[in-house]
Design a protein with these regions (language model features):
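Short acidic, Pro/Gly- and aromatic-enriched capping/linker segments at domain boundaries
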Residues: 115-135
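Polysaccharide-binding surfaces and accessory modules of carbohydrate-active proteins
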Residues: 1-112, 128-130
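Primarily single-stranded nucleic-acid-binding OB-fold modules
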Residues: 112-116, 186-187
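Acidic/glycine-rich phosphate/pyrophosphate-binding loops and surrounding catalytic core
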Residues: 99-107, 146-171
Length: 203
């Protein structure tokens, strides 16, 4: 996506054995990142406490961001991460790699930091309870991982993702869309026509 500074990567798995092969890991991408003052930013939350930004440095060992809630994962952990390469992330300056897994199901993002000069980033389907029986000559295609690079901080990476969504990744992204009115969060059990009309006017 040259108009958005986004690349997508994925993995295609096939085999020519006589019997099905059981797949147990589904990495869409692997990215080595040179060690330094590297930080990550990601979203975590829960009911009524969604999308809280967590920012932390990468240290030796393993860091895993994952979800096993299936299609209900949008209010807990998100399958996106910003990787700041030159210190604590800033909004408008600094080198940032943005990564977003294009997948609404169970996911796993993992950083392995060993005793060498790299952090190793893996992204894909969460392998917990996700085994897949791959038939001979069948092709299993993992979800895409969208990646961008910015030297304008978190904001620059975020704007690239917005352009990518508007310029074609999201179907009819520039068309007006209906809005779902969440009456439960707004009024709980006190639902009536007058209240609903007022909520719509407040949008």
């Amino acid at each position: 996506y040259t108009n958005s500074d986004i690349i997508e990567t994925w993995t295609e798995i096939s085999h020519q054995e006589k019997k099905p092969v059981m797949l147990q890991q589904f990495a869409s991408a692997y990215l080595p990142i040179r060690r330094g003052d590297v930080w990550i930013s990601h979203l975590h939350g829960s009911w009524a406490n969604e999308a809280k930004v967590t920012t932390e440095p990468l240290t030796t060992g393993m860091k895993v961001i994952k979800n096993k809630d299936g299609a209900r994962n949008s209010h807990t952990d998100h399958a996106e991460v910003m990787i700041s390469l030159d210190g604590k992330p800033q909004e408008n300056q600094g080198q940032v790699i943005g990564a977003a897994l294009c997948w609404s199901g169970n996911f796993r993002l993992r950083f392995d930091t060993l005793d060498d000069n790299f952090h190793y980033f893996f992204a894909g389907i969460n392998e917990d309870a996700s085994e897949y029986s791959l038939a001979p000559k069948e092709v299993f295609t993992t979800p895409e991982l969208a990646l961008t690079y910015s030297n304008e901080g978190l904001g620059g990476a975020s704007r690239s993702f917005h352009r990518w969504a508007r310029n074609g990744k999201v179907h009819n992204a520039k068309q007006p869309r209906d809005i779902l009115l969440n009456s439960w969060e707004g009024v709980y059990f006190h639902i009536n026509e007058k209240g609903m009309i007022q909520m719509m006017k407040d949008i």
